[in-house]
């Protein structure tokens, strides 16, 4: 009987440790400071813009391998951005994000996912298209424009 009690105490301890660990991991972004979240997402959007300009330049000049690597990098950045709009980051620290992002989070997330998917799609189309600039305009710049026109404060 004594070993059964010890066994149950051990199981309860393990269970509580696992629950505590899950709670800690799931709150990782909420514990992160609002400022750092906003700064990281601003940096990623800025990086994607710079990378997009480079993608266009490389693609138009026929350097498709390097352009494809950058497209994949941009796609990954959009995936990261999906996690960088928690409720506690709606305002402050010169964010240029509009409240509509949080009001219709599913639509915003769908656009970020589409942007990521379109960059991957672009890697398979860029070499075979007759109009690299037009294809890039549709699959890359079109998503940038859609996001800026709906979710970003105007300049």
Language-model regions, residue ranges each:
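Extracytoplasmic c-type cytochrome modules immediately beyond a signal peptide or single-pass transmembrane anchor
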Residues: 32-138
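N-terminal signal peptide c-region/cleavage motif recognized by signal peptidases
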Residues: 25-27
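The canonical Cys-X-X-Cys-His
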Residues: 139-152
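Bacterial N-terminal signal peptides
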Residues: 15-23
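Short Cys/His-rich "knuckle" micro-motifs
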Residues: 155
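A short, amphipathic alpha-helical segment
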Residues: 2, 53, 149-152
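Histidine-centered active-site/metal-ligand motif
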Residues: 29-31, 148
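Bacterial N-terminal signal peptides that target proteins for export
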Residues: 2-15
């Amino acid at each position: 009987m004594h070993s059964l009690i010890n066994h149950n105490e051990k199981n309860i301890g393990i269970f509580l440790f696992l629950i505590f660990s899950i709670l800690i991991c799931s709150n990782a972004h909420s514990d992160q400071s609002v400022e750092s979240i906003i700064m990281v997402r601003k940096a990623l959007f800025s990086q994607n813009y710079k990378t997009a300009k480079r993608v266009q330049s490389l693609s138009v000049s026929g350097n498709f391998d390097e352009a494809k690597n950058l497209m994949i990098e941009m796609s990954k950045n959009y995936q990261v951005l999906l996690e960088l709009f928690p409720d506690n980051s709606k305002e402050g620290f010169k964010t240029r994000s509009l409240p509509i992002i949080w009001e219709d989070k599913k639509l915003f997330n769908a656009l970020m996912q589409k942007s990521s998917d379109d960059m991957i799609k672009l890697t398979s189309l860029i070499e075979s298209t007759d109009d690299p600039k037009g294809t890039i305009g549709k699959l890359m710049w079109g998503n940038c424009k859609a996001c800026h026109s709906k979710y970003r404060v105007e300049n």
